[in-house]
């Protein structure tokens, strides 16, 4: 089994990559390491997994987990992502990468469309063209908007997002559903 994790320097991605690597699962992590969250924290997480970014390499093999490889990559870089999909045989893609932040999305909507919609489309296309059987992705509770029904339910209506961020995550849900129906 070989798993691709996007957003692997983020909080959830780091813990997931580490857990899979510890289990002996071939794990390939990518992350843009953008500055929305503290870059030094992301680098510290990678270092804790045995990834030394100071070596200035294209791919980094973990010194702690020989089955874990990391590459700095933005999902918006379609040629690089296409090359990655063509060079590896992934059984599962776990997409945790996203430009987060509700307030920031109101000031920088294009950043969210690029990362969360176009980037996710590149993931969907990679899975489709390379016949990857499983895609798991993280949505957000933001898709429920101003719903007063708490706790949220998966079958609750989520048709009225109140931020660009929430709209992009709802878009991801609809895109994934459509790709699943069209392409299996």
Residue ranges and their predicted role:
Residues 1-184:
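N-terminal Rossmann-like NAD(P)+-binding domain of SDR-like oxidoreductases, especially those catalyzing
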